[in-house]
Regions:
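Catalytic cores of alpha/beta
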Residues: 121-122, 181-199
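Conserved strand-turn element in the central/C-terminal portion of the radical SAM core barrel
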Residues: 113, 137, 141-145, 165-189, ...
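Conserved, mostly hydrophobic/aromatic
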Residues: 34, 42, 57, 76, ...
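Aromatic/hydrophobic pocket-lining residues that form the small-molecule binding cavity
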Residues: 57, 89, 119, 158, ...
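Auxiliary Fe-S-binding modules of radical SAM enzymes
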Residues: 1-22, 198-286
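Conserved SAM/AdoMet-binding glycine-rich loop
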Residues: 66-167, 247
Length: 286
C-alpha cells in the first residue's frame, strides 16, 4: 500500500478536521459524530455517533505509528471524543504509548458536560497520562441563547467545567459563534459571552461567525421567520461589542470568518486596541 492508501484506510472520511491550534498533530479516529447531536445550528456532526472498538483503534494506531513515528502530538478525532469513559481513554493512551512512544501531548474536542461527568480524580489521571488540551464549543455565554439553540448546557455548567480543567492543569481552547442569538439577542449574546469569558482563562478564543447550513433546524427557523439572521457587518459589530467588554489575559483572540473573507488575530489584552481598530477599519470600508 502507498502512504496515501494507508492514510485512507484509517479514516472514515476523505477530509479530516482538526483545530488549527493542533496543526501538525497526528490524528487518530476514535469516534464518529457527536454524542449530543442536538444543537440546532450544527452541521459539523453529520455522522451517527459511534465509538470505534479498541481493536480498530489499535489497528489504526499501528498504521499511524508507522506513518508518523516521530510525532509527539496526537489529536483524537470525534466531535466530542472526551465523552469516552476515562477507562477507555486510558486504554487508548496505553496503546498510544506502545505504537507512538514519542507522543507526549494529546488533545481532542469536548463538550462542557463531558468534563462534568468526570471526577476530579479522573481529570487528574487523564492529565497525568498526557491529555493536555481540550477544544470546546462554548458558542455563547447567554443562557436563553444556549437553550434556544439546544446546546444542552448552561453558562454556569460551562463555567464549572472549565474551572475544573484549570484546577487540573488541562489547557482549553474555546470557540464562540458571533451572530448565534440573531438580531434580537445580539447585544445579550455579546455582553453575556464577554461576561462568561472574563471569568475564564482560555488559551485561545476562536470566533467563527454563524453560518446557516441547509437542513439544520436553525436554517428552517430562519426560513419561517422565527430567527433573524444578521448581516456579516452586523455580526462584526456584535463581535466588536464583545471584544470591547473582554478582559481575559494571555489569550489569543482570532476570527477567521470576518465579513466572510478576512482573518483577524491578536493577543489579549495587549493587542485589544489593534483588534478593535482593525474591526473599525473593516466596518468603515465602502
Ligand atoms: S455539541 Fe458540538 S458537535 Fe455536537 S451537536 Fe452541538 S455543536 Fe454539533
Amino acid at each position: 500500500m502507498t502512504r496515501e492508501e494507508l492514510y485512507q484506510s484509517i479514516y472514515t472520511h476523505e477530509t479530516i478536521y482538526i483545530p488549527p491550534q493542533e496543526e501538525g498533530s497526528a490524528a487518530l479516529e476514535v469516534a464518529l459524530g457527536c454524542s449530543w447531536h442536538k444543537c440546532t445550528f450544527c452541521d459539523f456532526a453529520r455522522d451517527e455517533f459511534f465509538i470505534h472498538p479498541l481493536s480498530r483503534i489499535e489497528h489504526n494506531l499501528q498504521i499511524l505509528g508507522m506513518l508518523q513515528p516521530e510525532n509527539t502530538r496526537l489529536f483524537l478525532l470525534g466531535e466530542n471524543a472526551f465523552c469516552l469513559s476515562t477507562e477507555f481513554l486510558c486504554q487508548i493512551i496505553d496503546l498510544v504509548a506502545k505504537y507512538m512512544p514519542n507522543v507526549h501531548r494529546i488533545a481532542m474536542y469536548s463538550r462542557a458536560d463531558d468534563i462534568l461527568r468526570k471526577t476530579d480524580e479522573e481529570l487528574r489521571l487523564l492529565k497525568s497520562r498526557g491529555v493536555a488540551a481540550l477544544h470546546i464549543g462554548v458558542e455563547s455565554g447567554s443562557d436563553p441563547i444556549l437553550a434556544e439553540r439546544c446546546k444542552g448546557v448552561t453558562s454556569a455548567q460551562i463555567l464549572d467545567a472549565l474551572h475544573r480543567l484549570e484546577q487540573t492543569g488541562i489547557d482549553y481552547f474555546v470557540t464562540i459563534i458571533p451572530g448565534l442569538g440573531g438580531r434580537e439577542y445580539s447585544h445579550l449574546h455579546a455582553l453575556e459571552t464577554a461576561r462568561l469569558l472574563n471569568q475564564l482563562h482560555p488559551k485561545n478564543i476562536w470566533c467563527l461567525k454563524l453560518k446557516l447550513w441547509e437542513d439544520t433546524k436553525l436554517c428552517k427557523e430562519a426560513q419561517k421567520g422565527f430567527f433573524q439572521m444578521m448581516t456579516p457587518e452586523e455580526i462584526l459589530l456584535e463581535e466588536r461589542l464583545m471584544l470591547e467588554n473582554l478582559h481575559v489575559k494571555d489569550c489569543l483572540f482570532e476570527d477567521t470568518t470576518v465579513l466572510d473573507q478576512y482573518t483577524i488575530y491578536g493577543m489579549l489584552p495587549d493587542q485589544k486596541k489593534d483588534l478593535l481598530r482593525a474591526i473599525d477599519y473593516l466596518l468603515a470600508r465602502p
